[in-house]
Swiss-Prot record:
Gene3D superfamilies: 1.20.80.10, Phosphatidylinositol 3-kinase Catalytic Subunit, Chain A, domain 1, Pleckstrin-homology domain (PH domain)/Phosphotyrosine-binding domain (PTB). Component of a complex composed of PALS1, CRB1 and EPB41L5. Within the complex, interacts (via FERM domain) with PALS1 (via HOOK domain) and with CRB1 (via intracellular domain). Interacts with CRB2 (via intracellular domain). Interacts with CRB3 (via intracellular domain). This is Band 4.1-like protein 5. One of its GO terms (cellular component) is plasma membrane. Residues 359-391, 430-470 are annotated as: Disordered. Expressed in the retina (at protein level). InterPro entries: Band_41_domain (IPR019749), Ez/rad/moesin-like (IPR000798), FA (IPR014847), FERM/acyl-CoA-bd_prot_sf (IPR014352), FERM_2 (IPR035963), FERM_central (IPR019748), FERM_CS (IPR019747), FERM_domain (IPR000299). It is a peripheral membrane protein. Plays a role in the formation and organization of tight junctions during the establishment of polarity in epithelial cells. GO terms for biological process: actomyosin structure organization. Residues 43-327 form the FERM domain. The gene is EPB41L5. It comes from Bos taurus.
Amino acid sequence: MLSFFRRTLGRRSMRKQAEKDRLREAQRAATHIPAAGDARAVITCRVSLLDGTDVSVDLPKKAKGQELFDQIMYHLDLIESDYFGLRFMDSAQVAHWLDGTKSIKKQVKIGSPYCLHLRVKFYSSEPNNLREELTRYLFVLQLKQDILSGKLECPFDTAVQLAAYNLQAELGDYDLAEHSPELVSEFRFVPIQTEEMELAIFEKWKEYRGQTPAQAETNYLNKAKWLEMYGVDMHVVKARDGNDYSLGLTPTGVLVFEGETKIGLFFWPKITRLDFKKNKLTLVVVEDDDQGKEQEHTFVFRLDHPKACKHLWKCAVEHHAFFRLRGPVQKNSHRSGFIRLGSRFRYSGKTEYQTTKTNKARRSTSFERRPSKRYSRRTLQVKASTGKPEELSVHNNVSAQSNGSQQAWGVRSTVPVIPSGPVVVEVENLPKSPGADQHDKKWLSAAGDRSQRGGNQWDTRALSPPHPAPRNYPAFVHEHNVKNAGAQQNAHFPGPAAMTDI
């Protein structure tokens, strides 16, 4: 009897405490979306949006991921939702995308409240295909975070232009009576922001007079899309030699990096199989041999954790389906050449082809652009011109070598660098790996010769122009292919110790 009362009272106290936690969490969030029905049978999900605000959503305990995603899209009034996803971290600090077909509680183990982040999942290969102004605005916010966190590297000149577009979109036209050069120091655009860069941004901002926020954001995206690592979803892997490599998922295929050097590209049409088992990822690629016959090559990579391996596999499946197919693969389809073994996972959303063909911009939409986070202003030691716009002579001091944090953008400076203040962003570190042993790379010449005829590119010299796009290949994807297919000279790929060649 006593044990019965203990269990009953204990459960009641736990329910009361959970209810208090939900209310407290809802008060902390900027927006609270209550659940319909019995309030005792709900879970609380807290979603951080790209503009820095939080939304607290109450859902039934057995709610699936799609229900939460639909609530967020309805809250934002976002039509082009297929480019976005909800991301969360597991107990092993592995990032995952919320699966809309599975229960939230079965995926997100840490909670309640269950904390997730709205992120761009698929970077459009052609931002001009984005129909809605709100979608372009969210893309700009995501790219700002990518650049600020260091995930997306950006040359000095490009960083200055993008930052100037940000100022134009947020502050409007430059006003001599209101704006001074010190104003730029209140914003954060890059991980290491020097005074020279802020002066260059200030001068560039003057040139964009007359652009509306929507025009400035469109120009921002059209500039950012040419960055080498734009839209590349990086995953750190290990080869059998123990060295770190990176696989980058793109609209055209899978890039392979050794450190920061691009050493190969597997085009999606040439990848015949992609499997995983525990923490081992297997990639099977076909290419033409000397007699013109197709020959299979198997590459094996390992990850630190089985969950990270499955996450990489799922991301590859989704990228292939979103950018390459006209429609998602049906579950009852017998064509399972690309997706094999035990997982039943299938990409169920719209493809980019469907999104660009079916979505139409609404005649009138309204949304609020939230101001960026401001920091304390600093006094510039070098004054900028506040009169007629002139060319700033920053580029006369460009150095060929980077020497310390002050030279991070290749600019020689005579004034001290004031580092950026702390910024809360989602950081995804790029790999830093030592070079592979020379004896592991003797096979490169033969592979490089084969690559000039096949569909996969490995080189000891500069690469030849990319191969023609397959039939029915979207034109904008082919354009993105041409941009990303290049590799640096003297590149190497891990030797036979790292790969199993069948």
